[in-house]
């Protein structure tokens, strides 16, 4: 059976690369098999092997002691806005020590379009003229400091 390799690249823009895993852990879960896909490292990049047609979700687990903004993209497309991905875009705020399961691109507050492993020509990004990052799962993680509220006297 032919397999498709999806590359998971973790971009930590607010901290050093050596801190990967300290702000958040990122996993890819095959929804049909109900299991986390094993990560294979090669030349500094993380890869997971997906089965064609299987839906998957991206799981972000906040490992920081404060809230984190996660700007996540799949195939070079921001999962919240649907725009071509950029680190400065909107994302999800994840409370400290909590996790978030992202099962697809946000279509509305109640609907998502599922992520699934497929051939390049069938990918959403390629069909919308953005094939350059198909197979890449990216995340820019920002620690969010809470402003303290003081009562005025």
Where in this protein do the model-derived segments appear?
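Intrinsically disordered, low-complexity segments enriched in small/polar residues
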Residues: 17-152
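Sec-dependent N-terminal signal peptides
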Residues: 4-15
């Amino acid at each position: 059976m032919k397999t498709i390799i999806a590359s998971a690249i973790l971009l930590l823009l607010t901290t050093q690369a050596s801190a990967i895993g300290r702000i958040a852990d990122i996993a890819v879960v095959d929804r049909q098999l109900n299991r986390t896909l094993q990560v294979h490292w090669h030349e500094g990049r993380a890869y997971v092997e997906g089965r064609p047609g299987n839906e998957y979700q991206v799981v972000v687990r906040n490992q920081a002691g404060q809230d984190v903004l996660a700007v996540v993209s799949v195939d070079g497309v921001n999962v919240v806005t649907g725009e071509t991905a950029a680190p400065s875009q909107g994302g999800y705020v994840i409370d400290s020590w909590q996790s978030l399961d992202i099962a697809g691109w946000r279509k509305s507050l109640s609907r998502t379009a599922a992520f699934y492993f497929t051939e390049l020509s069938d990918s959403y990004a390629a069909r919308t003229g953005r094939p350059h990052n198909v197979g890449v799962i990216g995340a820019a993680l920002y620690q969010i400091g809470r402003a303290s509220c003081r009562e005025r006297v």
